């Protein structure tokens, strides 16, 4: 077994932690963490979702999403609304979050650009392709 095969998951985890740490630094002026940004990004990109849809999409445990949404709600970023089915609640961005979203997104896109600046376009395409394959398993 090659070095890469023995250590790839560890390297991916270390990279994810480093990226999350640096993302948190970018988001700190907005009072957000990367996990919260993931939920906001998800809601803006996909639209109103149930908590179950969010945790399913983000591949995280239900209690984690519940805590994250609770904090976002307490800080005025999201609100829960009655869904078409009376038993379900939809999580939606607040008007204030909609206003701030673009500013945060621009900052995060710049962060991503800087983070990947030393990579060739072909490398970025390969990363994207491999991660999509991995997520489809």
Swiss-Prot record:
<feature type="domain" description="HTH marR-type">
    <location>
        <begin position="5"/>
        <end position="136"/>
    </location>
</feature>
<dbReference type="GO" id="GO:0003700">
    <property type="term" value="F:DNA-binding transcription factor activity"/>
</dbReference>
<dbReference type="InterPro" id="IPR036388">
    <property type="entry name" value="WH-like_DNA-bd_sf"/>
</dbReference>
<keyword id="KW-0805">Transcription regulation</keyword>
<dbReference type="Pfam" id="PF01047">
    <property type="entry name" value="MarR"/>
</dbReference>
<keyword id="KW-0238">DNA-binding</keyword>
<feature type="DNA-binding region" description="H-T-H motif">
    <location>
        <begin position="51"/>
        <end position="74"/>
    </location>
</feature>
<dbReference type="InterPro" id="IPR000835">
    <property type="entry name" value="HTH_MarR-typ"/>
</dbReference>
<keyword id="KW-0804">Transcription</keyword>
<dbReference type="InterPro" id="IPR036390">
    <property type="entry name" value="WH_DNA-bd_sf"/>
</dbReference>
<protein>
    <recommendedName>
        <fullName>Uncharacterized HTH-type transcriptional regulator YwoH</fullName>
    </recommendedName>
</protein>
<dbReference type="GO" id="GO:0003677">
    <property type="term" value="F:DNA binding"/>
</dbReference>
């Amino acid at each position: 077994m090659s070095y890469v095969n023995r250590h790839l998951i560890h390297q991916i985890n270390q990279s994810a932690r480093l990226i999350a740490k640096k993302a948190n630094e970018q988001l700190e002026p907005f009072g957000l963490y990367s996990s919260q940004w993931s939920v906001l990004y998800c809601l803006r990109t996909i639209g109103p979702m149930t908590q179950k849809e969010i945790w399913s999409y983000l591949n995280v445990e239900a209690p984690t999403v519940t805590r994250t949404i609770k904090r976002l709600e307490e800080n005025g970023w999201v609100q829960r609304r009655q869904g078409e089915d009376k038993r379900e609640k939809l999580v939606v961005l607040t008007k204030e979050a909609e206003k701030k979203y673009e500013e945060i997104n621009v900052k995060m896109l710049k962060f991503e650009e800087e983070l990947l600046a030393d990579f060739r376009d072909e490398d970025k395409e390969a990363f994207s392709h491999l991660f999509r394959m991995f997520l489809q398993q």
